[in-house]
Amino acid sequence: MKEISVIGCGRWGTFLGWYAANYRVDKVTLYDIPTSPNFLELKETRKNSYLTLSDNMFLTPDLNEIFKNDDIIISIGCQHLRELAKQINQYNLSGKHFLLAMKGLEEPSAKILVDVMAEEITQDDVHFACLGGPGHVQDYLKKVPSCAVIDSREEAEKKHWIELMQSELIRFYYGTDVIGNQIGAALKNVIGIAAGILDGLEWYGLKGALMARAPVEVGRFIKHFGGNPMSAYGLAHLGDYEATLFSRNSHNRLYGELLAKGEQSSKSAEGPMTLKAVKIISDRDGIEMPICQALYRVVFEGADIKSTIRGMFEREVKREF
């Protein structure tokens, strides 16, 4: 009997558990801390705003139950990953496979998530992969198919997770650049904030320019960390633009739109914390990141939105390529 575990009962983690339970495995165990509002809602009603738990999905506040399975998906806030990794390193993790389903960088280090896990998990025979690419829960539940990418520093680990998760609903591709795909997935959230600001200002025509120039900037950041800048044009970054820059379901786009309107979003968004990390590293190492620098001034320094965003597109004239 195939079984997997999921750590994190938020929107995405619960969906991935539901997806696995309905398309790929016989049993899914979902974990969260017992005081988590998401966990309490699922425990009381067996549903959230998006889906109803299948009969083969089980909830637990006990990590011992999670580690009865070898395949574990993690979907929590990126800034809590190191703390979780330290906690679970106290368990016997030999032979375990972890799929990190979040999109972000650690702040302030700007470390990719697989490296955060590798630093804190000190045991042997523990394997890490990451998930990236487009897709919204609302679309998947309508059976709208999509594609995603799974990457790892271990070729066998990519194969392991793709064979476990592949279905007619989600086609998974093998990643070839774990650094580029993790950074690309994280920074698409930042670019989503920029797109939302343009929506809030009703400057829709600049979205095309944003889509053309942002991958160039993200590619620089990827290259700085030893990745392939072309990964910015793959599924994890450019391939996720429709779901992040245009969709009404994008939390990061909504964050930017409401910011431009002088309002606050009640939805969680990973983009702002990733933006902080990018700002620190780009300043320290002299990486040219004009879009991210402008966004930082708007989001964290209270800069005038219209003049700052306009200035971002009025920099010194240069060749496109």
Summary of predicted features, one role per range:
Residues 1-61:
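NAD(P)+-binding Rossmann beta1-loop-alpha1 motif at the extreme N-terminus of oxidoreductases
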Residues 10, 14, 22, 59-60, ...:
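Electropositive phosphate-/nucleotide-binding environments in soluble metabolic enzymes
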Residues 51-58, 124-126, 168-170, 287:
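A short helix-to-beta-strand connector/capping loop
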Residues 53, 61-143, 161:
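Rossmann-like NAD(P)(H) cofactor-binding subdomain of soluble oxidoreductases
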Residues 67-69, 187, 238:
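Alpha-helix C-terminal capping/helix-to-coil transition sites in glycosyltransferase folds
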Residues 105-204:
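Rossmann-fold dinucleotide-binding core
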Residues 194, 202-233:
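Oxyanion-binding "anion nests"
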Residues 195-196, 223-321:
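NAD(P)-dependent Rossmann-like dehydrogenase/reductase catalytic/cofactor-binding core
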